């Protein structure tokens, strides 16, 4: 058994690190009909199991897992968000939150049945150190579940591709295919209480030009947003090379 505590380089999140209160509004709007949770449950049910949420932010998703998991551990590299996550979950007995990055999880070998990451770190090529760490902390048969935005699903995916120079959703999908993941595409709706909240969220998600175009192309208080759920299980037996 060993724990990884070595410091690693962490890229700042362009939204939740700078605007945590507004990102909380975004979190509440996302997946308004629960499609991601249903797909995740179908692919890797966590009832009675030990769950790790990598890049847990302010802990928004931790209580959902904790409702029927044996234990839930949130790992987050940004100290202010670690404190927010601890405050959010202080009264939930089976949740723990640690400071750390995906490349060096502060956890022991074989301590988890499910490692979950939602729009955090695992964005395609370059995340291999995190994949290795997830395998290290997973027990045999455990699952790594990565929820990421689907850059091929309009309208949000089109805005994403226009905003992030060099982003290629086909190449991202090829990467996860080659790494042995299965993929489920999920159609969701972000539903905001106020139009002003929708516009403010788009302005923290995209650079000004793309944000204003996205606002102009969106009527009302809802945005269709596609996701991809990538799942890979750790082998249970001896691997012959």
Residue ranges and their predicted role:
Residues 1-47, 60-64, 143-174, 205:
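Conserved class I S-adenosyl-L-methionine
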Residues 48-49, 110:
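Nucleotide donor/acceptor-binding cores
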Residues 52, 57-104:
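Class I SAM-dependent methyltransferase SAM/SAH-binding core
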Residues 58, 177, 182-241:
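Conserved Class I S-adenosyl-L-methionine
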Residues 103-114:
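A short acidic, Gly/Pro-enriched loop at the edge of an enzyme's catalytic core
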Residues 113-127:
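A short SAM/SAH-binding and catalytic strip from SAM-dependent methyltransferases
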Residues 128-140:
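A short glycine-rich, Lys/Arg-flanked "PGG" loop and its adjoining helix->strand segment in the class I
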């Amino acid at each position: 058994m060993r724990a990884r505590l070595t410091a690693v380089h962490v890229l700042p999140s362009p939204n939740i690190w700078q605007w945590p209160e507004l990102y909380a509004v975004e979190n509440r709007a996302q997946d308004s009909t629960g499609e991601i949770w249903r797909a995740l449950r179908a692919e890797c049910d966590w009832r009675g199991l030990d769950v790790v949420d990598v890049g847990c932010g302010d802990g928004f998703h931790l209580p959902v897992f904790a409702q029927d998991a044996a234990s839930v551990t949130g790992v987050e590299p940004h100290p202010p968000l670690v404190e927010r996550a601890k405050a959010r979950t202080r009264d939930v007995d089976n949740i723990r939150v640690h400071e750390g990055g995906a490349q060096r999880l502060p956890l022991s070998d074989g301590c988890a049945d499910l490692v979950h990451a939602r729009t955090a770190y695992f964005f395609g090529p370059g995340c291999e150190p995190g994949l290795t760490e997830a395998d290290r902390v997973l027990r045999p048969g455990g699952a790594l579940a990565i929820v990421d935005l689907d850059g091929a699903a309009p309208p949000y995916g089109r805005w994403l591709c226009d905003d992030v120079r060099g982003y290629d959703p086909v190449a991202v999908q090829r990467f996860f295919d080659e790494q042995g993941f299965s993929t489920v595409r999920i159609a969701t709706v972000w539903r905001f209480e106020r139009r002003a909240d929708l516009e403010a969220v788009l302005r923290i998600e995209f650079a000004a030009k793309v944000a204003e175009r996205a606002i102009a192309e969106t009527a009302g208080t809802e945005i269709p947003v596609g996701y991809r759920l990538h799942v890979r299980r750790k082998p249970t037996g001896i691997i012959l090379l």
